[in-house]
């Protein structure tokens, strides 16, 4: 299982810090993007998922092409694998005392692989060479989240998203964004008081009392097309290398609506502000690995992943609509922004992986991986000097840190059936921060299990993986506004069908 938006706890905190700048310019890249596109959770086959992805020292599974390419050299026959997967993501939010649930279901392709093995017939020296080509899913961003609540009139603690627009317009009148303030002004939501010399909004003037709703729809993922070569030396030493082509897709559709349901705000009825971000990218990477069997019981593996170099294109736009008490409820104003097209480059951190596995004959396997990566090494480049990416790179170095990931799994052989279980821990890429007076970390724990059936020519594997995450989400600044507490439950059910030949 690969967590969906696992960096969200920190990403939302970053929104708090960066939101004051958000209204000044078009959307800028930040450390949240760097983390999102750098994290890999190795979906692959159902067997690998059931064992927590701990295949760095095992091999003999197409997931190895993306994890430790030396595992391709372990193959002693050719095979084809196909792994469709059902994603189920459920979120529950608590905002202003109200609990709201949302969900998303989707089928994806986790794996499609072809391995061709050529044995030499020798037990000493070069015993075989294997070529693999195929696809492994590395990360998924699919999630829906809904928040609802009512700002209590006259409480002294209420707020509105329009306060952001108004405050920024008054604090920075010389900076006017076509994506934010201009839309609020054109939708008649932010009038100007020429006597006071400032902008204002109906909701704040009336003392609040409006209902709020925000829905975030995220989709996409990262997949790797892997071209792998593996070799077997004396059935003790295995080598492998992968050239990987990554395809990245990420979409975020956010709509924020506020309504005067109680009819206590003069003139104002409702407004909706929408943000759309669509991201596509292609990246290239190279991986190399080794597996050593000092004795038949033990396997030791090591792998190194060079940084992935992405070229990314983003399309970003917003729109705002409003209705007032003197109309029929249809949008009296609808104001779209221009579409901003932006291209940039991202270099992700390298990864180093150490693995060990114990094989108890044909009875059982126990395996574990340790993975290290330093998120501070992520780097943006626009091939220009006017997009502020140099400042974002400084922020990456200051906000992010190195992280350790640990995966463990076990498999028990019971006749034609195999029972599997696994767990994985992905360390937080963020330095400790304060949220509501408490330290928070964006680490992830995933539990998994499954079973498999194998014959000489055909095998079928099933897996189930579950992740639970909790994080805070602030809809807007100021920082002392009420945040939403989000609980996410992500499940993946995968099935792999394979044929040996």
Regions found by a protein language model. Give the residues of each.
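Outer-membrane beta-barrel porins/channels
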Residues: 29-43, 48, 117-501
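Alpha-helical transmembrane segments and their juxtamembrane interfaces
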Residues: 20-21, 78, 417
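Bacterial Sec-dependent N-terminal signal peptides
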Residues: 1-32, 497, 501
């Amino acid at each position: 299982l690969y967590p969906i938006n696992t960096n969200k706890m920190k990403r939302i905190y970053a929104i708090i810090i960066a939101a004051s700048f958000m209204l000044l310019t078009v959307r800028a890249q930040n450390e949240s993007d760097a983390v999102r596109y750098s994290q890999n959770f190795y979906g692959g086959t159902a067997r690998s998922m059931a064992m927590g992805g701990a295949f760095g020292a095992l091999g003999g599974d197409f997931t190895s092409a993306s994890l430790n390419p030396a595992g391709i050299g372990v193959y002693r026959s050719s095979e084809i694998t196909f792994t469709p997967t059902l994603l189920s993501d459920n979120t529950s939010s608590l905002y202003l005392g109200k609990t709201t649930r949302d969900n998303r279901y989707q089928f994806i392709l986790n794996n499609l692989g072809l391995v061709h093995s050529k044995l030499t017939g020798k037990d000493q020296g070069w015993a075989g060479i294997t070529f693999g080509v195929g696809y492994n899913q590395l990360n998924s961003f699919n999630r829906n989240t809904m928040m609802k609540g009512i700002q209590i009139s006259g409480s002294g603690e209420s707020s509105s998203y329009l306060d952001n627009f108004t405050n920024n317009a008054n604090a920075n009148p010389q900076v006017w964004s076509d994506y934010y303030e201009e839309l609020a002004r054109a939708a008649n939501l932010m009038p100007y008081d020429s006597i006071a010399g400032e902008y204002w909004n109906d909701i704040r003037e009336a003392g609040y009392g409006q209902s709020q709703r925000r829905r975030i729809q995220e989709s996409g993922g990262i997949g790797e097309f892997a071209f792998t070569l593996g070799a077997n030396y004396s059935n003790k030493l295995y080598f492998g290398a992968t050239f990987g082509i990554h395809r990245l897709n990420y979409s975020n559709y956010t709509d924020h609506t506020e309504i005067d349901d109680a009819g206590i705000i003069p003139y104002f009825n409702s407004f909706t502000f929408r943000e759309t971000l669509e991201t596509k990218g292609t990246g290239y990477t190279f991986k190399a690995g080794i597996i050593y069997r000092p004795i038949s019981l033990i396997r030791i593996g090591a792998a190194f992943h060079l940084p992935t170099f992405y070229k990314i294109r983003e399309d970003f736009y917003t729109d705002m609509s409003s209705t007032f008490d003197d109309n029929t409820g249809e949008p009296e104003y609808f104001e779209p922004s221009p579409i901003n097209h932006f291209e940039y480059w991202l270099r992700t951190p390298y990864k180093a992986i150490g693995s060990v596995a114990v094989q108890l004959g044909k009875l059982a396997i126990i395996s574990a991986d340790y993975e290290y990566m330093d998120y501070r090494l992520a780097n943006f480049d626009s091939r220009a000097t006017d997009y502020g990416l140099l400042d974002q790179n400084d922020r990456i170095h200051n906000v992010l840190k190195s992280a350790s990931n640990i995966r463990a799994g076990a498999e028990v052989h019971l006749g034609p059936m195999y029972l599997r279980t696994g767990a994985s821990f992905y360390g937080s890429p963020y330095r400790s921060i304060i949220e509501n007076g408490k330290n928070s970390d964006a680490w992830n724990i995933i539990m998994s299990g499954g079973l498999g059936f194998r014959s000489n020519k055909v095998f079928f594997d099933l897996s189930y993986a579950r992740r639970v995450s909790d994080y805070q989400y602030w809809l807007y600044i100021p920082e002392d506004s009420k945040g939403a507490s989000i609980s996410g439950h992500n499940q993946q059910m995968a099935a792999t069908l394979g044929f040996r030949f």
